[in-house]
Structure formats: C-alpha cells, structure tokens
UniProtKB/Swiss-Prot annotation:
Record key words, sorted: Transferase
PANTHER family to which the protein is assigned, alphabetical: ACETYL, PROPIONYL, PYRUVATE, AND GLUTACONYL CARBOXYLASE-RELATED, METHYLCROTONOYL-COA CARBOXYLASE
Family note: Belongs to the AccD/PCCB family.
Transferase keyword on record: yes
InterPro entries: AcCoA_carboxyl_beta, ClpP/crotonase-like_dom_sf, COA_CT_C, COA_CT_N, MCCB/AccD1-like
Residue ranges annotated for the CoA carboxyltransferase N-terminal domain, each copy included: 20-271
Record's protein name: Probable biotin-dependent acyl-coenzyme A carboxylase beta2 subunit
GO biological process per UniProt: mycolic acid biosynthetic process
Pfam assignment, any one: Carboxyl_trans
Length: 529
C-alpha cells in the first residue's frame, strides 16, 4: 500500500498546480478550435441542411452516458490546416462493444483530407488493428485536398489497404455514409464489411457528373450516378437503406449488436478506487522539470486501492518498477524517479520487462528522464551496452505498452521508456511534458563549445555577443519544439490529457487492449553482457 507525503497546502504544491493549470488553459484554448469545426458559419449551414456535425453523430452512436476517448484532437496544430485535421477519431462503446470511430468533419473544407487527416486516419487504423477494435467510419468527405494531393495520393492508399487487412484479421469494418463519398473516398464503403446509406443524402461515386461528362460525354446527376437508392437496388454497394441520419445511426448500432463480439483478453478484477484524490495530480510536477519528484505520488492516485508491489526498490532507485491493477486490469509500471538512467536502472528495467512478458502483463511507462548517464566512468562501466539492453527489451516485448509523458523525455531515455518509435499501443502526455534530443540549455551549450573549439583552431577570437545570441536562439527553438502542443500537433502522441483524467484514460486504454489476446514473449535480441 503506497503512502503519500504530498502536502496540498504547501506553497510548492500551489505553484505546481498554478503552472499546470495555466498550461491546461493553453491546451484547452486550442482544443476549443478543434471542437468548433469550420466555425459558426459552416456549422449553421450544415445544420440548416438537416445534417448533424461529426461529434453530434458520435454522441448518438455511442452508448448513453458512456465516455468517448478522443484521439489526436490537436492534429495539424502549427500547420496551415484547421486544428483537428477535419476529422474526429476516438474509442467509444457501441452496444457494449468498444469501437474505433472515424468521422469526417464536413464543416471544414467539405471534409476533404489533407496530409494531417491522412496521418490521423492511419494512426486510428493502427490502434484498431493492434487492439482488435471494430472500425466505424462516419463518412462525409469531398475526397483529397487537391492543393496538397502530392502529399496525400501515394501514401493515401494505405488507408484502404488498412480496411481490407482489418477485415482479413476478423475485425469488422462498418461505414455509415452521411453525404458525399467521392473519388478515393468511395473506397471507404467499398472496402468496408457493412455499408449503410441514407435516402437522398448519400452520394458515392468514383467521379461526379462534371468529371463523367468531361471523360465520357455522358449526362448524369448525383442521385442516378451514386445515390443511396441506386446502390441499394442496383449496384449492391449499400447493405442497408436508411431514411435519415438518425435511422442510419440506429442501423449502425444494430450492426454492432449483431457482431457477437467477444473480448479475447482477461476480464478485469473488481475495481477499487485509489486512496488518494486524483485532483491532487495537478500539483505534483514542479514548474522546473530539473527538480525531481516522486512518481509514487502519481502511481498512488491512479492504481486500484493505491496498492503497488514494488520490484527491486533498493536497486537502481532512479527507476521505480512494480505491479498494480488499474480499473481491475493487471499492470506493470516503470516510472522515472530522478531523471537519469544508470546501468543499474537499465538492468532492472530489462529484467522487469522480461518478467512482464512471462506473466502476460501490459506495461505502463511514466516518463520523466533526461536520458542515460554520460561520463568517462559510466562509459567504462558499460553504460552503452546496459542502455542498449533496456532498449532491446522494450523493442522486442510483445505485451501491450502504454506510455505517458509526465515530465521530461529526452535523448535515448525517451527510447528506453518506450517512446513513439517503439510502438506503444497508446501514448499520451501531460501539459507539463517536454521531449527532445536533449534540453535546450544543453543543446545550445554543446553548439557553443563546438563553435568555440572551431574558432580557436582557426586562431580567431570568439565573438561573445554572437555566441550568446546563438545560444539564446537555439535554446528558445528547442524549448518551443519540445512542448506537448507542438508534438501532439505532429501526432507524436495520441493526445495531451488533464492529469486528473489519467486514471480514466488509462482504464479505457486497458479495456480497449483487452479486446485482443495479451501474450508475452521470451524471444529477445542478443543481450550484450
């Protein structure tokens, strides 16, 4: 049973909470832009036509009063495209079955797909495939964003390949077509197992009337060329003919109810709430990430009953490892305690990951690391081979991994703690997180040392003012590029979450993971001893 020494009345807590709240406000301001879609003008126009927005459709599709875990909501932040990438993706329960829902937003440039839309769809498909989640596509899209077609067309074929591979793996794919599904978009219903179209609303064709006339000289209209009734009566592309949007959603729910879906993972044990208040998670991470904090304070507020069986507590103490349950699901946890990873921590992590694979237990990585230790003594002591051992174990582990960046995640430590490149099933960040090859001060300092050495080799004087300006510019650049808003916009995580929602988000992830089998491995790469 974990104990807590966190004092919510302390000034350090107040400062940390105020800083985190400020960062949350900044995140929420950007999320509001995604929620607004194309803005009041286009949303009102959409409603005036009798249509629902994608989030309204999702709300009616998922079970009443059940949560919806939205993924990649900040996609395209910092780009020339609307935040959210004209697409809503996430996991929700439909008739008790956890599904990946992918919904075009027609209020944003007609729901056309830009490069960030494609990345977001592919990430959603990857999550669905890895976790065995049925996919429901809520289709209303004008196809590719033509000005950026060179970035979309060639890689874009993967989203259709994904649908067929999902189907081949026994993972159902369902398309509810609410409006236009043209050109390449026509292959979304074409590649789906179940297709619902709406009377006088759904339009599915490879080429619209103007293009058909130009190519063949044939005169046609939307309805005769690709309307719902034609596809239901003649082409056979539509499996179900809905009268309106609500009817289409009703039919979609009935399709899911008839899937006879059975989870292949373990059933959860009875759930007990943590002993400590989740609201206090907002005041744990110091404003200055160089100040260490105890990750057990986080663990105590997210795991069932605040019960945590720590593994090797006296060895490699900069990394906390141990076993717990979260929303009833067994879980192994690796959490950075004092930033730097030494040889002992690397060996400890490697053994722990092997044990988790032996026990078929998912792993949660809580990031707050500046990387692996450097220096002559540590190089001689085998830091490279021990760090490589940990990365080897993370790379070849086959139990599901979830990563949560709560503080720093720098250098190869990001890799060893299962960063994005190591394919965690889910990766989220707190607003306090930062991730880069190294801290801004360190990187600018390295560049300064190199520049000074080069100047001395040429027999030149160092321009101190220019050096100071360079260091300030580089430090500012790295600081900006390491922030969660920027990284989330690039889809390097699956979302930036409120720390107080951590237990709920992780519980939903573990429940989604349990749709597929959980099986560890004993087949790791060669460990260099």
């Amino acid at each position: 049973m974990l104990q807590s020494t966190l004092d919510p009345n302390a000034s350090a807590y107040d400062e940390a909470a105020a800083t985190m709240s400020g960062k949350l406000d900044e995140i929420n301001a950007e999320l509001a832009k995604a929620l607004a879609g194309g803005g009041p003008k286009y949303v009102d126009r959409h409603h005036a036509r009798g249509n629902l927005t994608p989030r309204e459709r999702i709300e009616l599709l998922v079970d009443p009063d059940s949560p919806f875990l939205e993924l990649s909501p900040l996609a395209a932040y910092g780009s020339n495209f609307q935040i959210g990438a004209s697409l809503v993706t996430g996991i929700g329960a439909v008739c008790g079955v956890e599904c990946m829902i992918v919904a075009n937003d027609p209020t944003v440039k007609g729901g056309t797909s830009n490069p960030w839309t494609l990345r977001k769809i592919l990430r959603a498909n990857q999550i669905a495939f890895e976790n065995r989640l049925p996919v429901i596509s809520l289709v209303e899209s004008g196809g590719a964003d033509l000005p950026t077609q060179k970035e979309i067309f060639i890689p874009g074929g993967q989203m259709f390949r994904d649908l067929t591979r999902l189907s081949a793996a026994g993972i159902p794919t369902i398309a509810l077509v609410f409006g236009n599904s043209t050109a390449g978009g026509a292959y979304v219903p074409g590649m789906s197992d179940h297709v619902v179209m709406i009377k006088e609303r759904s339009k599915v064709f490879l080429a619209g009337p103007p293009l058909v006339k130009m190519a063949t000289g044939e005169e046609s209209d939307d309805e005769s060329l690709g309307g719902a009734e034609m596809h239901a009566r003649i082409s056979g592309l539509a499996d179900y003919f809905a009268l309106d949007e609500l009817d289409a959603i009703r039919i979609g729910r009935r399709i899911v109810a008839r899937l006879n879906w059975i989870k292949q993972g373990p059933a959860p044990a009875p759930v007990t709430e943590p002993l400590f208040d989740a609201e206090e998670l907002i005041g744990i991470v110091p404003p200055d990430l160089r100040i260490p904090f105890d990750p057990r304070e986080v663990i105590a507020r997210i795991v069932d009953g605040s019960e945590f069986d720590e593994f090797k507590p006296l060895y490699g103490s900069s990394l906390v490892t141990g076993w717990a349950r979260l929303h009833g699901y067994p879980l192994g946890i690796l959490a950075n305690a004092r930033g730097v990873l030494f040889s002992e921590e690397s060996q400890k992590a490697t053994q722990f990951i092997q044990l988790a694979n032996r026990a078929d237990t998912p792993l949660l990585f809580l990031h707050n690391t500046t990387g692996y230790m450097v220096g002559k003594d540590y190089e001689e002591g085998g830091m490279i081979k021990h760090g490589s051992m940990m990365i080897n174990a993370v790379s070849n582990s086959t139990v599901p991994h979830i990563s949560l960046l709560i503080g720093a995640s720098y250098g190869a430590g990001h890799y060893g703690m299962c960063g994005r490149a190591y394919d965690p099933r889910f990766l989220f960040a707190w607003p306090s997180a930062k991730s880069a090859v190294m801290g801004g001060a360190q990187l600018s300092g390295v560049l300064s040392i190199v520049a000074r050495a080069a100047a001395e080799a040429r027999g030149q004087q160092v321009d101190e003012a220019a050096d100071a300006a360079m260091r300030a510019a580089v430090e500012g650049q790295i600081e900006a590029e390491s922030l969660p808003l920027v990284l989330s916009g690039m889809l390097y995580d699956d979302g930036v979450i409120d720390p107080r929602d951590t237990r709920t988000v992780l519980g939903m992830c573990l429940s989604a993971i349990a749709n597929g089998p959980i099986k560890g491995t004993s087949n790791f790469g060669v460990f260099r001893m």
